[in-house]
Design a protein with these regions (language model features):
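Well-ordered mid-protein domain cores that form the structural environment of catalytic cofactors
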Residues: 106, 147-153, 157, 177
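Non-catalytic DNA-recognition/assembly elements of restriction-modification systems
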Residues: 1-54, 179-185
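A short beta-sheet element
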Residues: 91-92, 96, 100-148, 161
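Short coil/turn segments at secondary-structure boundaries
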Residues: 54-62, 157-159
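A short glycine-rich beta-alpha junction/loop motif
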Residues: 107, 121-128, 160-184
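Sequence-specific dsDNA recognition surfaces
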Residues: 39-54, 65-96
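Alpha-helix initiation and N-capping motif
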Residues: 38, 60, 139, 148-152
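A broad, structural micro-motif
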Residues: 36-39, 137, 168
Length: 185
């Protein structure tokens, strides 16, 4: 991207900007090692489209993601919830090994991998779930990268909304490049 630099102003040509937000143009580099090739997160994470309609007479296990790399756990201490008590009727079914993001708490390091005991549980659209291309990256490595202070700061910068409801821009998240060693390493 060609950028003309003046004392107080930076100019970039629109055709050279992959994301038209001012924040993207002036974002700080995350400072990851140059030892490995960089890859966009969207090149190995694909959003799950496994959505269901909640049935009032069925029971469901729900998922939440703890902040500060605290893990992915069952909501309500693992108690099942009747569909009639669930307000959002369209939800996503999760599977073990998928990567999950809390849109609201990504700025606080709320990323994780669905554990085996939450197979088949559900989440709202505020928790995007991604299938991981394990031929390119291990889900645990993505958790490691996404909970570094630099990455959490990136998540904070690309979150917008009112004070306690700032949500990460998932498109910016998927466009972010990270170092990607070979899976064998």
């Amino acid at each position: 991207m060609s950028v003309n630099t003046f004392k107080y102003i930076h100019f970039a040509h629109y055709k050279d900007i992959p994301n038209w937000s001012v924040q993207y143009v002036v974002e700080e580099k995350l400072g990851f090692t140059k030892k490995y090739p960089m890859a966009k997160i969207g090149s190995f994470l694909k959003k799950s489209k496994n959505q269901i309609e909640i049935q009032d007479d069925a029971e469901y296990k729900q998922v939440t993601v703890k902040i500060n790399n605290g893990g992915v756990i069952a909501r309500n201490d693992g108690q099942l919830k009747r569909g009639s008590e669930i307000g959002t009727k369209r939800q996503t079914v999760v599977h073990a090994g998928q990567f999950i993001v809390s849109k609201i708490d990504a700025r606080n390091g709320a990323f994780g991998v669905i554990p085996d005991d939450l197979e088949g549980a559900i989440v709202t659209n505020d928790f995007p779930v991604f299938d991981v291309d394990s031929s390119k990256i291990l889900p645990q490595f993505m958790v490691l990268i996404s909970t570094t202070p630099q990455f959490v700061e990136f998540a904070r910068k690309c979150s917008s909304g009112t004070t306690n409801r700032k949500r990460i821009d998932i498109n910016m998240f998927l466009m972010q490049s990270i170092p990607l060693p070979k899976v064998q390493e």
